[in-house]
């Protein structure tokens, strides 16, 4: 029913194979005929023909081996020295770059630390006095009831930046109690966003 297995098929010889087989058979017949006529001479000729290519192959192999052994010795020393110098110079450049970057980072961090220490000592006092005044005014606007203060500790958290307090910024918004400085964004302010502006007059 099914197709025959293609693996079990014996391959038919191609035309070239047929020609080669015919030539081999002819050579065998000729050699047998010659051997029957003059067996001693034929044996000597066959041995000589077999020995000659073997000797030639051995000589060629020996020459190749000798050439391969001589090749590594012929590499000029100048090329080796140049390659090692390139490697050293590349490594030295890489190390110098690393040292520079590390020293730059270290010096910048030192500058930053020194500057931050100065800022902390000098400006902390001014910020604390200005901020306490602002916090006192904010707490007056939104002071919790007496009962709530017992249960909750009051923290004054303003969504706006309190670092820039100048004379014009000390005017507080009626909507959220934040300072109306340059950094006050009413769209980003959590308190300003929740206030309904439909009833309030426009602020100038």
Swiss-Prot record:
Q: In the UniProt record for this chain, what is stated about the effect of gene disruption? A: Schizonts develop at the same rate as wild type parasites and are morphologically normal at the end of cycle 0. However, proliferation is impaired during the subsequent cycle. Expression levels of MyoA and MTIP are severely reduced. Expression levels and subcellular location of GAP50 is not affected. No visible defects in intracellular membrane complex development or morphology in the intracellular merozoites. No defect in parasite egress from host erythrocytes.
Stated consequence of mutating residue 89 to A: No effect on GAP45 phosphorylation levels. Severe reduction in GAP45 phosphorylation levels. Reduces phosphorylation by CDPK1
Targets GAP45 to the cell membrane: where is this region?
2-29
| Signal peptide stretch | none
Q: Which residues carry this modification: Phosphoserine?
A: 89, 103, 149
Q: Which UniProt keywords apply?
A: Lipoprotein, Membrane, Myristate, Palmitate, Phosphoprotein
Q: How is this protein situated with respect to the membrane?
A: Lipid-anchor
Protein name (record): Glideosome-associated protein 45
Q: Where is the composition biased (Basic and acidic residues)?
A: 9-53
Q: What does this protein do?
A: Component of the glideosome complex, an inner membrane complex structure involved in parasite gliding motility and host cell invasion. During the asexual blood stage, required in schizonts to recruit MTIP and MyoA to the inner membrane complex where they assemble with GAP50 to form the glideosome complex. By regulating the formation of the glideosome, plays an essential role during merozoite invasion of host erythrocytes.
Output the PTM entry: Phosphorylated at multiple sites. Phosphorylation increases during the schizont stage and peaks in segmented merozoites. May be phosphorylated by PKB. In schizonts, phosphorylated at Ser-89 and Ser-149 in response to phospholipase C-mediated calcium release. Phosphorylation at Ser-149 begins in early schizonts while phosphorylation at Ser-103 begins in late schizonts. Phosphorylation at Ser-89, Ser-103 and Ser-149 appears to be dispensable for GAP45 inner membrane complex localization or GAP45 inclusion in the glideosome complex. N-myristoylated by NMT. N-myristoylation may contribute to the targeting of GAP45 to the inner membrane complex with the subsequent palmitoylation strengthening the interaction with the membrane.
Species whose genome carries this gene: Plasmodium falciparum (isolate 3D7)
